């Protein structure tokens, strides 16, 4: 089935390339070999390859050849108060390619009154005409309605979508109740898709926002104060509980705190099928900047859940990422200019949420995890590319350097260093939340769909060249365990005879507006237990008694001291 839709942008001829002398790095092995690329695919891998004449040769000696990065979380068209982000599909995907990412997964967020299917079509139209690299789509469920099952089924079967996100925050806008989550998770499980959650306790956040605003706290620091770490951790634990009961695989987006990450790690150790996604911001900086005297700088950090002010959080998250307790990395890239952020200059709750990270993600993970010795080059490939491709079911088309895979490749220089700055980034915003951070490791050449997109610091991109990548359901990486548990977890009642004894009659409380309380129906004869009447006791102080026939003395004198006799020589 084709999911390409109505896209009519002409395909651009791919380059014919020979990458020589590089060290190929996949998630499970590394080796030296040459790579022949043609028609947008990897044609050959090996030594002394026979290739056509006139082919472009790229010298990769001393460098690594990696599968292109996959950014699992972007919001390049997220509508906020009638505004759209500064980095749209064109600028955002250009920045992605500059950083070594060759595929993104963007979130469809339906406007009020717009169906999931209609919103999906809107996103496809925007991305097809502007994206510079390949992309796919998650769909956010922003409200519950009776026909949601039919919409989800259509998106899965007809549109190539296999992941849906629900919100536990943003009360009165898109927050789901626990019962709604359980029902949605059950539908998603039956469809073979993946349930995602934005995990925060929206009720507490709203109350904290009101309290802080009443105290006169209106600046960006109010945002982090109204989103304490505990509301994220509690929501993660609750989401894990609901997903486990529904036997639905769970994917937690934007893991920002130690508590949330630990809740995921502990759930995995209990056997829950759950995946956690730290983002560039939570791995590369901290939330101390919310208290900056520069309002615009502080506002640039506003996102939900917030960047944690604890400076040890990033180290904790990179440790869990290196150990496998967290599996993927995203950017949650959603940027707004200072003028757009200033909509909330007098009320932190109105500041558009979102940070940058799409361009910096690959280098930041290398700096924090590989250069620091926490993970090796293969694990780096896993958390920046391969695991995402496996979880969302487009592996090995993406996420692997192998014959037949898409020619989305990054020639990586582990010795390169760069200092992140708003003066040099490929974004349309004035502030970069990683300003001044020095990173070791950077892309030297980026190849997208078999075409060179970055070389010698120069970009070669074409808006609209990006293709939509459809995803099938029931990915093995996720659903093998779910299927096994479905077979093993069948529930059977205990075989027993029908109870036919007495049943006590009770009053069932009436529902509001239904009139008088109803009497519970009882199938058997009612047996009323006896009640003792104290006024009808058989005991009497007058008349004949049962022991009147026993002879009694009129009196008996007892010779004993007060308290009775005692014998100090005997303890018996």
UniProtKB/Swiss-Prot annotation:
Chief location category: cytoplasm
GO cellular component: cytosol
Modified residues (Phosphoserine): 537, 544
GO MF annotation terms: filamin binding; hydrolase activity, acting on carbon-nitrogen (but not peptide) bonds, in cyclic amides
GO BP terms, alphabetized: nervous system development
UniProt KW keywords: Cytoplasm, Phosphoprotein
InterPro entries the record matches: Amidohydro-rel, Hydantoinase/dihydroPyrase, Metal-dep_hydrolase_composite, Metal_Hydrolase, Metallo-dep_Hydrolases_sf
Keyword Cell membrane part of the UniProt annotation: no
Pfam families, per the entry: Amidohydro_1 (PF01979)
Subcellular localization(s) per the UniProt record: Cytoplasm
Gene3D superfamilies associated with the record: Metal-dependent hydrolases, Urease, subunit C, domain 1
Purpose of the protein: Necessary for signaling by class 3 semaphorins and subsequent remodeling of the cytoskeleton. Plays a role in axon guidance, neuronal growth cone collapse and cell migration.
Similarity annotation: Belongs to the metallo-dependent hydrolases superfamily. Hydantoinase/dihydropyrimidinase family.
Database matches in NCBIfam families: D-hydantoinase
Protein's name according to its UniProt entry: Dihydropyrimidinase-related protein 4
Source species taxonomy: Eukaryota, Metazoa, Chordata, Craniata, Vertebrata
Gene: DPYSL4
